């Protein structure tokens, strides 16, 4: 870890001014990912801008019937918030599926969106990595890539996005509110994270002078038929090999509306609106779900060690859709203490 300076932002405008004045500075809230990156010399900010005292820690109802979640709401508080439990249990389930109680107590909602990949080549500064050092190469292609992406990859990067919470937010069609020197703007969640393309070092569409202030959820939370299925190597404190967030609206024996997002398979939470349209109007049967899985994975590509993830994702999609249709969501009860 290199030396750095520290300052505390007094308000959002001050935070924006400070980050705009120093392109090498970083905001810090919970620090659950940033501090790790600094210890490994992957992130080397000249200055940390403490934003923990900004008034961004509220969960509030908004005029369209949805919910606004402040960027500094801790993950643990959000998971157990009564509005989330009653109206958006998919989000609460996804949060509880991730990390550990200690990390969820510290991690902020906005920071969760900005965490970096857990690709071990990204963390190992002795190996080539286009995300860490653009133009150096991707060690995971042709290397050990069991945890890596099968969708949306490029010749530059096959890393995955690590968040569980973001997979649920993608399925719920959330919006990200940000503030920068140009003022406030709203980013559709599906547009917030990027695929690697030729610039894998850039994870999101957040501009260098912007700060996340809130995440908004629309009024529909799919509280009746949902699930967050996380498939991983061990029960506690493990990143997803594949995860599936599903929300269904079922009426008169048919799927009226479907939301489906995958984690652990791409550089961003993977949502396929063509598959959602294919599910709409269809009966909630095993055959319907198998066809949806086949469509979603039509362009999936393995890289050797992770070839198994294609079939694992196919089975995970079918199981998650089945759980949601039956109203029997995957339990995260064990994660309350593990």
Locate the predicted segments by residue:
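C-terminal structural segment of proteins
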Residues: 1-338
């Amino acid at each position: 870890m290199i030396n750095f300076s520290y300052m505390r932002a007094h308000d959002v405008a001050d935070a924006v001014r400070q980050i705009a004045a120093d392109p090498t500075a970083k905001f810090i809230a919970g620090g659950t990912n940033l501090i790790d990156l600094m210890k490994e010399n992957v992130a080397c900010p000249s200055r940390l801008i403490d934003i923990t005292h900004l008034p961004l820690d509220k969960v509030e109802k908004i005029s369209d019937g949805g919910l606004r979640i402040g960027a500094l709401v801790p993950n643990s508080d959000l998971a157990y918030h009564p509005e989330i439990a009653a109206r958006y249990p998919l989000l609460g389930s996804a949060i509880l599926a991730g990390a550990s109680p200690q990390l969820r107590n510290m991690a902020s909602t906005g920071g969760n969106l900005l965490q970096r990949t857990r690709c071990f080549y990204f963390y190992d500064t002795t190996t080539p990595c286009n995300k860490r050092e653009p133009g150096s190469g991707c060690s995971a292609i042709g290397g050990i890539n069991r945890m890596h992406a099968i969708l949306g990859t490029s010749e530059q990067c096959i890393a995955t996005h690590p968040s569980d919470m973001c997979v649920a937010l993608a399925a719920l069609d959330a919006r990200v509110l940000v503030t920068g020197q140009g003022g406030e703007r709203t980013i559709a969640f599906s547009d917030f994270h990027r695929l690697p393309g030729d610039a894998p070092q850039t994870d999101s569409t957040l501009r260098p002078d912007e700060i996340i202030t809130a995440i908004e959820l629309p009024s529909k939370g799919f509280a009746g038929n949902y699930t967050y299925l996380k498939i991983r190597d061990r029960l506690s404190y493990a990143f997803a090999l594949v995860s599936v967030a599903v929300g269904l609206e079922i009426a008169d024996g048919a799927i009226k509306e479907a939301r489906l997002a995958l984690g652990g398979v791409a550089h961003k939470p993977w949502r396929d609106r063509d598959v959602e349209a294919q599910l709409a109007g269809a009966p909630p049967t095993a055959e319907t779900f198998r066809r949806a899985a086949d469509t979603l994975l039509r362009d999936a590509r393995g890289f050797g060690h992770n070839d198994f993830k294609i079939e694992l994702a196919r089975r995970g999609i079918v199981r998650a859709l089945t759980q949601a249709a039956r109203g029997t969501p995957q339990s995260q009860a064990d994660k309350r203490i593990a």
